[in-house]
Amino acid sequence: MTAQTPIHVYSEIGKLKKVLLHRPGKEIENLMPDYLERLLFDDIPFLEDAQKEHDAFAQALRDEGIEVLYLETLAAESLVTPEIREAFIDEYLSEANIRGRATKKAIRELLMAIEDNQELIEKTMAGVQKSELPEIPASEKGLTDLVESNYPFAIDPMPNLYFTRDPFATIGTGVSLNHMFSETRNRETLYGKYIFTHHPIYGGGKVPMVYDRNETTRIEGGDELVLSKDVLAVGISQRTDAASIEKLLVNIFKQNLGFKKVLAFEFANNRKFMHLDTVFTMVDYDKFTIHPEIEGDLRVYSVTYDNEELHIIEEKGDLAELLAANLGVEKVDLIRCGGDNLVAAGREQWNDGSNTLTIAPGVVVVYNRNTITNAILESKGLKLIKIHGSELVRGRGGPRCMSMPFEREDI
């Protein structure tokens, strides 16, 4: 990394030097059973324990010499002038789907009254309950205020924010500022916009943009993997469509970030396998975790760029051989989540046994709960850093989902 290129990520396994996290906050306490599906959750984590688990995760990374950054801090540091701060509030409000002018005015006054920038950022993440606002006179209520009177939020919370992998993705020296699958999560990308536009270190055009949040097609960071300085992998999944991938790849090739080929993985479109990194991650030069349930239906396309056109070929044959050929290694070992046991594979994939964070070649952060997969990884010679995640996992994400590398050593 240099002052001119503050992002440097050319692999999934190079020694991790700097990483972005988000400590779960009050947005988790704004989850409630009636609206879990709307907010993309299956259960409600206990915030106090989730924070303890997340703090232990962050400390485990620091113990390995990794600098830990926080989304909420960088976003606060990006509000460098009163004008930018006010613009952020107005843009946040414009995307918050607020019902009624009087409600919007009251929320704006609430946010403008918060003096501390980090407190402001954390409030926007937490959402706004209607009970926090002054009573709106009946004469000022619109039809939507009356019809939706039982819905408790004036602005929905953003409980998925601790999965920092998805709203944007670092690729080489650039960043893909994503347009996300759901309205609930798409608001999260606003923080990345302000960081990469206004932050003293990461803003001001220092980081090339290879995708923009204003695109109409969807892509998420869990489907964007940097296999090497030459090869990317992208997932065509529940959350990422093929049209977005084509736009992303054209931009990456045009910006000359160094990549020569992309492997596009098409697999089952469902919540269980919402992103490529929930079923497939790189853990060493020649080793990957994979969920066995995707192997039968998996289709892989090689994409290159020449004469200002994408060239796409569907690959046939063995996945391990394809990966070995593209990574320049003799052979690749695909390590199956849960081993050969169908029940263990399903259970441990649901608990993110395949969603590993590699912090150096062969050194991997995992949830301790996935005992069968972990034992297999250790039998392959991998060093595991095991973290507790009984509350964190309720959001359906593991160590890779909860982290966004900003700097890795080259391999």
Swiss-Prot record:
Enumerate the active-site residues. 401
Q: Name one GO molecular function term.
A: arginine deiminase activity
Name a biological process GO annotation: arginine catabolic process to ornithine
Kindly report the protein's main subcellular placement as a broad class.
cytoplasm
Localization, UniProt = Cytoplasm
Cellular component terms per the entry's GO annotation? cytoplasm
Q: In which pathway does it act?
A: Amino-acid degradation; L-arginine degradation via ADI pathway; carbamoyl phosphate from L-arginine: step 1/2
Enzyme superclass (EC): hydrolase
Q: Which UniProt keywords are given for this protein, alphabetically ordered?
A: Arginine metabolism, Cytoplasm, Glycoprotein, Hydrolase
Family per similarity comment: Belongs to the arginine deiminase family.
**Full protein name:** Arginine deiminase
Which species is this record about? Streptococcus pyogenes serotype M5 (strain Manfredo)
Lineage from the top down?
Answer: Bacteria, Bacillati, Bacillota, Bacilli, Lactobacillales
